[in-house]
């Protein structure tokens, strides 16, 4: 009976021995370890893990076969049962030892796969997030607008001085023309550029000497006299200009600038004086008066008036001379014929 009870206990231990390595802590760690790692990545395909049952099955068969004869040969005892249980558990330990190095390998293999899949997932996420990035590309479009807008502003700003620059030149040219009209030599190009621009309606500069050698004050007096004479004359709005504004080429000789070598208008004052000796006293006196007026207008610079007055004086003096000669001849004929 003792042998039968020991055999039954050994058989129970042998039957429980495969359950222990399958249900031991090593098996729980092996089963729980990899699923925890794989739970983080749902997309990873679960690789077939060599469970402890598969590895332990051939290992356990050896000890079972070896234990059976040992248990049958040995008598029933506590020491033998303990040894049997230890031997039965030892394959589980071996299985644990065999499984424990494999678990880290499985974990290490799974970790690179997880990292690769994580990087792939991150790349896919970045690619999915990357398409919105081209949205800021329209930003370069506003660039031509600021470029197009400032181009007119700098163009306008430099043009302002360019537009203002011709004004001194125009003023200098107008002053030069006035000086030429007033018988004044125009300013030289160097003087006009270096000196300040003269203000309009300003007296001629002192640097420009007049052509006739008269000072600027004399020219101003001549201009004022011309204005006064026009105010008192019967033709205030006459288009005929004076010497101060329109220099006549007739006054200019071969030695004067702008002169064509023409003669000055004659006043015929000598012919008028000769006509005064003729018996045409009202006519010759008027001719002499016109000759004097022609000379005065020529001195004042009114060339057109001098020519007009000179022509009248010439006509009257000729009439006086011819009429006087005819009167003298008629008187002589009458007197000589009567006394015969």
From Swiss-Prot:
Keywords: Cell membrane, Cell projection, Cytoplasmic vesicle, Disease variant, Dystonia, Epilepsy, Membrane, Methylation, Phosphoprotein, Postsynaptic cell membrane, Synapse, Transmembrane, Transmembrane helix. Residues 9-18 have a biased composition (Basic and acidic residues). One of its GO terms (biological process) is synaptic vesicle fusion to presynaptic active zone membrane. One of its GO terms (cellular component) is dendritic spine. Its main location: membrane. One of its GO terms (molecular function) is syntaxin-1 binding. This is Proline-rich transmembrane protein 2. It comes from Homo sapiens (Human). The gene is PRRT2.
């Amino acid at each position: 009976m003792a042998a039968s009870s020991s055999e039954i206990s050994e058989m129970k231990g042998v039957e429980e021995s495969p359950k222990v390595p399958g249900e031991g802590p090593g098996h729980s760690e092996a089963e729980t370890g990899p699923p925890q790692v794989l739970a983080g990545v749902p997309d990873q395909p679960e690789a077939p893990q060599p469970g402890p049952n598969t590895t332990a099955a051939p290992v356990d068969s050896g000890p079972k076969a070896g234990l059976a004869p040992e248990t049958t040969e040995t008598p029933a005892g506590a020491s033998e049962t303990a040894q049997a249980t230890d031997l039965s558990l030892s394959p589980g330990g071996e299985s644990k030892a065999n499984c424990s190095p494999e678990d880290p390998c499985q974990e290490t293999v799974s970790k690179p796969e997880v990292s690769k899949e994580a990087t792939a997932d991150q790349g896919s996420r970045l690619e999915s997030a990357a398409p919105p990035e081209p949205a800021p590309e329209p930003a370069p479009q506003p660039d031509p607008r600021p470029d197009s807008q400032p181009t007119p502003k700098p163009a306008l700003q430099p043009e302002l001085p360019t537009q203002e620059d011709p004004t001194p030149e125009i003023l200098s040219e107008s002053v030069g023309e006035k000086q030429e009209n007033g018988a004044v030599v125009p300013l030289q190009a160097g003087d006009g550029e270096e000196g300040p621009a003269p203000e309009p309606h300003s007296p001629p500069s002192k640097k420009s000497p007049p052509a006739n050698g008269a000072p600027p004050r004399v020219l101003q007096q001549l201009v004022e006299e011309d204005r006064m004479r026009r105010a008192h004359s019967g033709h205030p709005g006459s288009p005929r200009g004076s010497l101060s504004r329109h220099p006549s080429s007739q006054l200019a000789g071969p030695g004067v600038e702008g002169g064509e070598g023409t003669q000055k208008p004659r006043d015929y004052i000598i012919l008028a004086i000769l006509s005064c000796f003729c018996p045409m006293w009202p006519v010759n006196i008027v001719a002499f008066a016109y000759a004097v007026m022609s000379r005065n207008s020529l001195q004042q610079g009114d060339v057109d008036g001098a020519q007009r007055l000179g022509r009248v004086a010439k006509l009257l003096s000729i009439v006086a001379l011819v009429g006087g000669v005819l009167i003298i001849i008629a008187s002589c004929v009458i007197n000589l014929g009567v006394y015969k």
